Amino acid sequence: DTSYTVMYLAKEKGYEVYAACANTGGFSAEQLKTNEENAYKLGATKYVTLDVTHEYYEKSLKFMVYGNVLRNNVYPISVSSERIFQGMAIARYAKEIGADAIAHGSTGAGNDQVRFDMTFLVMCPDMEIITLTRDSNLSRQEEVDYLNSHGFSADFTKLKYSYNVGIWGTSICGGEILDSKQGLPETAYLKQVTKTGTEQLALTFEKGELKAVNGEHFDDPIAAICKVEEIGAAYGIGRDMHVGDTIIGIKGRVGFEAAAPMLIIGA
């Protein structure tokens, strides 16, 4: 959705597009490099990564650990808790460069559109908010066809799903999620099962913060969380489905994989 937005605004509308990725811990250095390369291929004038991982941890994530927070006793609020911090980072950058508008790829299906729109309206009230996918009611296939027809080649095999990756888990939307009774196939998950059997996991907390994993001490709690995620994801731990009420008044169904949250909260 965002890729389509960048290309369409640059090629069809003549916008000078500044592409920004607000990273809350979900991207590796390699993935961020790919984001940058793709942004320029799509027609962006400039690309930046805005790292807000530690801000997110200090102002939100650690309190969810303190409170063992699970929405409806199922969902660790994986990506939804990050959206405000991503939105604020984008808004600050938009003001820094003197942007006339802010565009995002929300589809209109759930809560993210509200989180982003409200953040931008509060922090950048004079800027136009552009949401092509939502306002034009575009299907994912229409966007893929447009990108292909304009020479942008990529692996679109998983584009039946929409992934939002963060340090506190990955949400998966689309495909079987749109049916009330189907589960996700193994191939839908970004992190594949590579281990079977059992393994001992020892977590050490100091004043509610994760400080050590299997005796290995971490000065940075974020690094400790990533270590737990690496261990648990290999076994497919933390995969589930959540159904809840959205801000816009409809039921929302989302799949997720969140090994670290489920292990840490369980501990």
What are these regions (language model features)?
Residues 1-267:
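Nucleotide-activated chemistry modules centered on ATP-dependent adenylation/adenylyltransferase
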